[in-house]
């Protein structure tokens, strides 16, 4: 919990964010501050996302080896939202996380990392401003199940809860069903 983090530790990480010359150290400081609900961290993290290639390879997926850096950023941003909302600033947090989360959705259109936490966030909070981005995401990845199978199903599940007409129309257009994308576990 953020209240358990000593103020001197927060200040030390802020100094790293401002004074370090290394991009890696700045990124890790920004991610940590973001997860603690510190706005300076979120701003710096979003700035680092402006050149995605500089972050690629920071984290690898533990099973499949693809770049998982943006999934890690996603976790920090959703924690940011939770921490700021817990302080009573839900509307402020909602506005502040919109840009980084939509950037993550857009990057995920062409990269294999998972964004299921965004779908959970959107469904749980009923933040419909994300729907155009999620619709576009599904439209772009649905023809590439070899890369995005789990993500396709996750996006379908999300949109079935919030915009089922869109999902059914897209599936009909592609001559597919939800079952065509349901993940199965090989035995």
Language-model regions: role of each:
Residues 66-70, 94, 108-112:
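Short capping loops/turns at secondary-structure boundaries
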Residues 102-129:
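Ampipathic, surface-exposed secondary-structure segments
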């Amino acid at each position: 919990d953020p209240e358990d983090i000593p103020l001197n530790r927060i200040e030390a990480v802020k100094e790293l964010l401002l004074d370090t010359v290394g991009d890696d150290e700045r990124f890790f400081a920004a991610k940590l501050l973001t997860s603690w609900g510190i706005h300076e961290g979120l701003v710096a993290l979003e700035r680092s996302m402006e050149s995605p290639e500089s972050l690629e390879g920071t984290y690898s997926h533990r099973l499949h080896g693809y770049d998982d850096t943006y999934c890690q950023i996603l976790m920090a941003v959703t924690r940011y939202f939770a921490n700021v909302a817990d302080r009573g600033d839900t509307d402020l947090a909602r506005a502040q996380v919109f840009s980084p989360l939509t950037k993550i959705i857009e990057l995920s259109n062409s990269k294999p990392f998972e964004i299921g936490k965004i779908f959970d966030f959107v469904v749980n909070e009923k933040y419909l401003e994300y729907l155009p981005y999620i619709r576009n995401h599904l439209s772009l990845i649905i023809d590439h199940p070899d890369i995005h199978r789990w993500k396709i199903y996750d996006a379908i599940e999300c949109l079935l809860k919030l915009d089922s007409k869109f999902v059914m129309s897209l599936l009909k257009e592609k001559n597919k069903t939800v079952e065509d994308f349901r993940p199965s576990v090989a035995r």
